[in-house]
Regions:
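Short loop/turn segments immediately following beta-strands, especially the blade-tip
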Residues: 41-50, 92-101, 150-154, 201-210, ...
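Structural signature of eukaryotic scaffold interfaces centered on beta-propeller domains
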Residues: 15-20, 67-77, 116-123, 172-181, ...
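Surface-exposed loop and turn segments in beta-propeller and other repeat-based domains
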Residues: 53-67, 105-112, 155-171, 209-225, ...
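Loop/turn-rich, solvent-exposed surfaces of beta-rich toroidal or solenoidal domains
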Residues: 272-353
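Beta-propeller domains
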Residues: 169, 174-300
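Short, solvent-exposed loop/turn segments at conserved positions within beta-propeller repeat blades
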Residues: 32-35, 85-88, 136-142, 191-197, ...
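Blade-loop segments of beta-propeller domains
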Residues: 51-121
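Asp-box/WD-like beta-propeller blade repeats and closely related beta-sheet repeat scaffolds
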Residues: 95-178, 189
Length: 401
């Protein structure tokens, strides 16, 4: 599977502003699972003669991990956390010198928790992660939140299980609101064994689970299923949460004893329970929410200056087999890196947004020379680390400069 009045959002502390990013980092799996998964560094400088070329790679030293989520934006310390979901491992890449990337460390599960999914930085430099499962003998149950120090050592953890409310909760993604001492998490099961409508509210200071909200259906009747990505609005108090079934919900009241969630928007979903049909990892640029829509083979730009009344202001229609899934923005810029499924499985696209109007367009210059379709081609035979064949990118972020 798999985030606003000038409402610039993020998953935690404010993102930096900068001039154009020179690189994009993409976490990719070897397509035939015969060679190591790896992180690729791509030239993202539009002035460069090597624009869209792969300038370096660093193997993870592990095969078939299913590279999935990275952090949603490049952290200030230059160390990017990423998960190999099927292997239940975290990989930390040192990208302080982008043309010489290195694997800083890797580690497994902080038992009893397993299968890390999403990561968010905390003001103290630690990393808070969602873990889908708690291992219980020969089976698995609802996981929880785990806080790590910068070296990957577990500091504390908390269970997300609420069997009386929703036994299908599987901690998925998260948004941190330090000023309110709150964390908001979603609950989608990566294996689709359950279809949770839960959003959970936590106290950040001690990781106490305060509240589990079950989203109500929207106008279509099924928008509440599979809660996906929360993003914090610029007021630091309001959160928008999307669902894989293409609903959008507003969560507020986080500064009080009881938070509230309400449906505000729906986009098209074809009803198929598969990654290439879902609405997935969004990005927010200024007052615009950029939603990948697998069903519509498009990126959709919503003006959310009034979070109760999102309205479509831009749309980028891709190829008829392209299913965009992951969107990440350039810090302070107007570019978006996009990965996905279907026709995008072994490609990465660059889009641009007009920060004044929300209009979207494809950057066709960001294309591998000789490729038949726009984007960086990951279906190649040879990489800087060797002739390991095609790869499938998923998590992707821009460098901070």
């Amino acid at each position: 599977m798999a985030a606003l009045a000038a409402c610039h959002a993020g998953t935690g502390p404010a993102r930096p502003t900068s001039s154009a990013s020179r690189f994009v980092f993409l976490w990719a799996g070897d397509a035939d699972k015969a060679a190591s998964d790896f992180l690729a560094v791509v030239d993202a400088d539009p002035r460069s003669a090597g624009y869209a070329s792969v300038v370096a790679t660093v193997p993870a030293g592990a095969i078939g991990t299913r590279p999935h989520h990275t952090e949603y934006a490049m952290p200030a310390d230059g160390l990017l956390w990423a998960n190999g979901f099927d292997a239940s491992r975290t990989f930390v890449f040192d990208l302080r010198h982008p043309e010489r990337p290195a694997l800083a460390r890797t580690f497994g599960d902080p038992l009893p928790y397993g299968h890390p999914h999403s990561y968010a930085r905390l003001p103290n430099g630690h990393v808070l992660a969602t873990f889908q499962w708690e291992m219980a003998g020969g089976h698995h149950e609802t996981g929880g939140l785990v806080e790590f120090d910068p070296d990957g050592r577990m500091v504390r953890a908390a269970r997300a299980a609420v069997p009386a409310i929703d036994p299908g909760v599987r901690p998925y993604s998260l948004a941190v609101l330090p000023a309110l001492d709150r964390v908001v998490t979603t609950a989608s099961d990566m294996h689709l064994e359950s279809r949770s409508a839960a959003v959970q509210i936590w106290r950040l200071s001690d990781l106490t689970l305060l509240q589990t909200i079950l989203l109500a259906p929207g106008r279509r009747g099924d928008e509440q299923q599979l809660t996906a990505e929360p993003r914090v609005l610029a007021d630091g108090r309001t959160v928008l949460v999307n669902t894989f079934t293409c609903g959008l919900y507003r969560v507020d009241g986080l500064d009080g004893p009881t938070a509230r969630a309400r449906w505000v928007y729906s986009s098209t979903w074809n009803g198929r329970w598969e990654g290439k049909s879902f609405c997935a990892v969004p990005e927010v640029v200024g007052r615009f929410w950029i939603q990948p829509s697998g069903t519509e083979h498009a990126l959709v730009s919503l003006d959310v200056s009034d979070p109760d009344q999102p309205r479509e202001v831009g749309r980028l229609v891709l190829g008829d087999t392209d299913a965009p899934h992951w969107v990440a923005g350039e810090p302070g810029g107007d570019r978006l890196i996009v990965t996905g499924y279907g026709g995008l499985e072994s490609r990465a696209l660059m889009a641009r947004i007009d920060r004044a109007t929300g209009a979207l367009r494809l950057d066709e210059a960001f294309t591998t020379p000789g490729a038949a379709r726009p984007g960086v081609d990951f279906g190649r035979d040879t990489w800087p680390h060797g002739a390991t064949g095609p790869a499938i990118p998923h998590g992707a972020v821009f460098s901070r400069r």
